[in-house]
Amino acid sequence: MKRSKTLRAADAKVDREKLYAPLEAVRLAKETSTTKFDATVEVAFRLGVDPRKADQMVRGTVNLPHGTGKTARVLVFATGDRAAAAEAAGADIVGDDELINEIAKGNRLNEFDAVVATPDLMGKVGRLGRVLGPRGLMPNPKTGTVTMDVAKAVTDIKGGKIEFRVDKHSNLHFIIGKVSFSDEQLVENYAAALDEIVRLKPSAAKGRYIKKAALSTTMGPGIQLDSNRTRNLLVEEDPAAV
């Protein structure tokens, strides 16, 4: 009952009819965070695209300037010097045929958050699509995860580079940090994600592109964002600055 009252009190602070400026939303999200741990801050977008059509797929990567607050665990499929370079760059798991077989059997799937592969191994890694695909972990040249420069890929991912892909319901989800981040850090991470989504707008997409955006913390209420606001995001309420 006590927990329920806490959640209801947090929910009551959010105006469901209002579209909040990003800075105001971040401050409200922190105020309404109810967890005792350092909660994750997430943004969800609803896009005006049909992901069933190849020319309306939205997929890419973005380097969050302040990271997500969590260091990603990276698995790399590589051999020889490339494998050594991946290990030196901080890859958590490195291997080739034996590792591919392990993953194919569904083993170790909870030990990594991102996957990188060299092009020469993609013929073998390709058969992992059934296992990695549904988890959004399949290496892809378009996102820089199929590359000979595995060291750079590992460094980028651990430095805050995240991969995203619109789901079948036309939604995109981003973790933009932790409640412990400063307001400015969270807004700047949000801005980086928003800029990349706007940049990747498919030419085939008609009508309003970003239909809805909402920010929330772990177990916190959803806060509707003014998705038309794409500039001067660190200004809270000055309409002239929008």
UniProtKB/Swiss-Prot annotation:
InterPro entries: Ribosom_uL1_bac-type (IPR005878), Ribosomal_uL1 (IPR002143), Ribosomal_uL1-like (IPR023674), Ribosomal_uL1/biogenesis (IPR028364), Ribosomal_uL1_3-a/b-sand (IPR016095), Ribosomal_uL1_CS (IPR023673). Transmembrane segments: none annotated. The keyword Ribonucleoprotein applies. It comes from the Bacteria. GO terms for cellular component: large ribosomal subunit. One of its GO terms (biological process) is translation. The keyword tRNA-binding applies. Keywords: Repressor, Ribonucleoprotein, Ribosomal protein, RNA-binding, rRNA-binding, Translation regulation, tRNA-binding. NCBIfam families: rplA_bact (TIGR01169). Part of the 50S ribosomal subunit. Belongs to the universal ribosomal protein uL1 family. This is Large ribosomal subunit protein uL1. It comes from Streptomyces sp. (strain FRI-5). The gene is rplA.
